[in-house]
C-alpha cells in the first residue's frame, strides 16, 4: 500500500475520477517497511506522469512516430490453451480464467495477472466478472516484495476514497475512467501507471464460497527500451500531478483544437456522381480540424451519409478513402458520436480532430455515389503551420466491406478461424483507431472472438484479447459514447441487425516499423452469417497501405 496513506490516496484517485463516494472498507496488516530509493527531480526522467498526460491529449504528437523506443503489448485473461496457430486450441474461448501464475506473497495465495521487468507504463486496464468482486488487487513496483498499492475489489469502479472535497462533484467520470454504468463491473481505466523497473499485479480472492470464479481482464502497456528512465507511480506523483490529471480529464470530455490558422471551405449541391473538391493551402502545413455538413432534403439520411465517399490526398498520394458515415466513427447509419478524435451529431454534421500534416499540397474530395439522390454538402478545414521532422507521419483511413462472413459457435474450436480485420504494411506507422460494424443475421451476440494483433516479425501476437465487447471497453451490449470507445448503434436487444463499435487510441497506440496484422476470431453465441464493415485509422509513412481496403 505505498502503504497506509498510499492505498487510500492511490485508490482515492480512481473514485474521484468516478465521482463516487466510498463504500468499501480498507483493511491491512502493516508489512515490513519498504524503503524506496531516493528519487531525483522529475525533470531528470524521460517519462513522468505529466509527460504521459501531455502526450495523451496532444493531437500533434499523435502524428509522429515515438521519440522514445517502446513496444505496445497486451496482457489478458485469454485462454492459455491458445499457443499454436492452426490448432483447435488456438480458438479456445475460456477467457475468464487465464493468468500468468500462482504464487504466495506474505502468506497470501495470489494469482499473478501481470508481471513486467524494466521500464514501462500501463496505458489501459479493463476488468469485469460475473461473480462477486470480493477480491484484493495488489500492485508491486520496481521489484518490491511488499505491495505498494492495494485495491479492495475486482472492480475499477469500486476503487474509492477522495482526494479532496473539490473533486466530489466534478465531471471526472468518463474521461480517464469509463465506468460500466449499465453492466456490473465492466469498466476501463486510462490513467497511465508508469514504473521504472518492473510492475507486478496480483489478485487475492476473498470469498471462499466462490469456486474458481471467472476474472476477465485486459491490461495494455508499453515496454520501453532499458535506456529510457521512467518515474514510478507513487503517492507523491499523484499529488504533484493532481491539477494536470483534472485538466486532462476535462479535455478528454471536451476536446479543444487550435483556433488559429487559415480557414478554407467549399460547398455545393451534389447530384448523383458529382464531387465537391476542397484544395488546401500549399506548403508544409497540417489540417488541425475538418468539418463536414450534409443536408439531405428528402434523401434518407443514412443513405446519404453512406453514399458520400470522402477521399483525401496529400503530396500527390491518396491516404483516406471512406464513406462519411464510417469516417465519422459511427459506421452505417451515421449515428451520433462523441469521441476524442471525432464528433458527429447524427444529423449530417461531422467534426474531425485528426491532425493531417503534409509537406507540399493536399485536398479533400466528397463524391456522391448515389444513383438517384441529390444532397447539399459543405467541407471546411482549419490549416496551420506544422513542423515536419523525421518522426512525422501522414494520416490514413481506409474502409472495407465483407459480405456473408461466417460466425462460428464460440465453443466449436475445431472450426474456428481468424478473419483479417486489417493488415497494414509498407513502412512505419502507429495504429490509432478502428470502427467495427457487424450486421448480424442471428439473434444472439456475434462478438465472442478474440483480437490478435501481430507487429512486424512477432512469432506470437503481442495483443491477444478476450472478445469484441472487451476490446471496445463496454462489456454490456449497450449503446454508449466515450473518448476512446463506444457503441453508437445497437439495432435490437437480441443483437440482430447492426452492432457498431469504435475504438480510438492515444497512449495505447500501436507502433510498427514494417507491418501490423490485426486478426479477429469470428465466434458468437449462435452460428450464422453476418455482413461486416470496418474502418481503420493510422498514421504512417506515405506509402503504407491497408491490404484489401478501398
Positions of the model-derived regions?
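Bacterial N-terminal signal peptides
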Residues: 9-19
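Bacterial N-terminal signal peptides that target proteins for export
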Residues: 1-8
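A broad, structure-centric signal for solvent-exposed, well-ordered loop/edge residues
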Residues: 8-9, 226
Amino acid at each position: 500500500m505505498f502503504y497506509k496513506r498510499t492505498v487510500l490516496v492511490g485508490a482515492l484517485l480512481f473514485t474521484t475520477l468516478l465521482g463516487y463516494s466510498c463504500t468499501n472498507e480498507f483493511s491491512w496488516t502493516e508489512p515490513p517497511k519498504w524503503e524506496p530509493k531516493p528519487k531525483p527531480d522529475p525533470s531528470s526522467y524521460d517519462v513522468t506522469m505529466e509527460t504521459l498526460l501531455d502526450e495523451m491529449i496532444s493531437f500533434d504528437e499523435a502524428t509522429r512516430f515515438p521519440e522514445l523506443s517502446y513496444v505496445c503489448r497486451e496482457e489478458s485473461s485469454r485462454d492459455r490453451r491458445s499457443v499454436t496457430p492452426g490448432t483447435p486450441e488456438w480458438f479456445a474461448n475460456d477467457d475468464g480464467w487465464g493468468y500468468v501464475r500462482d504464487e504466495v506473497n506474505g502468506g497470501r495465495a495470489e494469482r499473478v495477472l501481470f508481471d513486467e521487468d524494466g521500464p514501462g507504463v500501463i496505458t489501459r486496464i479493463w476488468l469485469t466478472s460475473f461473480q462477486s468482486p470480493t477480491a484484493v488487487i495488489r500492485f508491486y513496483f520496481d521489484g518490491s516484495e511488499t505491495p505498494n498499492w492495494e485495491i479492495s475489489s475486482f472492480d475499477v469502479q469500486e476503487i474509492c476514497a477522495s482526494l479532496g472535497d473539490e473533486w466530489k462533484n466534478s465531471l471526472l467520470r468518463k474521461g480517464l475512467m469509463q465506468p460500466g454504468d449499465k453492466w456490473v463491473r465492466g469498466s476501463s481505466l486510462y490513467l497511465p501507471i508508469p514504473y521504472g523497473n518492473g510492475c507486478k499485479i496480483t489478485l487475492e480472492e476473498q470469498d471462499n464460497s466462490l469456486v474458481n470464479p471467472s476474472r476477465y481482464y485486459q491490461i495494455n502497456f508499453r515496454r520501453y527500451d532499458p535506456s529510457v528512465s521512467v518515474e514510478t507511480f507513487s503517492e507523491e506523483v499523484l499529488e504533484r500531478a493532481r491539477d494536470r490529471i483534472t485538466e486532462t480529464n476535462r479535455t478528454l470530455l471536451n476536446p479543444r483544437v487550435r483556433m488559429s490558422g487559415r480557414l478554407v471551405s467549399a460547398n455545393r449541391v451534389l447530384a448523383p456522381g458529382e464531387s465537391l473538391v476542397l484544395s488546401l493551402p500549399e506548403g508544409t502545413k497540417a489540417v488541425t480540424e475538418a468539418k463536414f455538413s450534409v443536408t439531405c432534403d428528402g434523401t434518407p439520411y443514412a443513405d446519404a451519409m453512406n453514399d458520400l465517399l470522402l477521399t483525401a490526398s496529400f503530396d500527390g498520394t491518396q491516404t483516406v478513402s471512406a464513406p462519411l458515415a464510417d469516417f465519422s466513427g459511427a459506421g452505417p447509419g451515421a449515428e451520433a458520436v462523441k469521441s476524442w478524435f471525432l464528433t458527429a451529431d447524427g444529423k449530417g454534421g461531422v467534426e474531425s480532430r485528426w491532425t493531417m500534416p503534409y509537406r507540399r499540397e493536399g485536398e479533400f474530395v466528397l463524391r456522391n455515389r448515389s444513383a438517384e439522390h441529390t444532397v447539399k454538402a459543405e467541407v471546411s478545414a482549419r490549416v496551420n503551420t506544422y513542423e515536419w521532422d523525421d518522426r512525422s507521419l501522414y494520416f490514413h483511413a481506409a474502409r472495407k466491406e465483407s459480405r456473408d462472413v461466417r460466425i462460428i459457435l464460440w465453443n466449436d474450436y475445431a472450426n474456428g478461424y481468424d478473419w483479417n480485420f486489417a493488415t497494414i504494411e509498407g513502412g512505419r506507422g502507429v495504429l490509432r483507431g478502428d470502427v467495427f460494424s457487424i450486421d448480424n443475421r442471428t439473434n444472439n451476440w456475434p462478438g465472442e472472438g478474440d483480437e490478435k494483433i501481430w507487429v512486424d516479425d512477432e512469432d506470437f501476437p503481442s495483443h491477444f484479447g478476450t472478445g469484441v465487447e472487451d476490446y471496445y471497453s463496454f462489456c454490456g451490449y449497450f449503446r454508449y459514447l466515450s473518448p476512446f470507445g463506444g457503441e453508437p448503434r445497437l439495432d435490437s436487444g437480441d443483437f440482430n441487425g447492426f452492432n457498431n463499435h469504435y475504438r480510438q487510441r492515444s497512449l495505447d497506440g500501436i507502433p510498427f516499423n514494417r507491418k501490423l496484422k490485426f486478426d479477429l476470431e469470428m465466434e458468437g453465441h449462435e452460428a450464422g452469417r453476418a455482413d461486416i464493415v470496418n474502418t481503420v485509422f493510422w498514421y504512417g509513412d506515405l506509402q503504407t497501405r491497408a491490404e484489401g481496403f478501398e
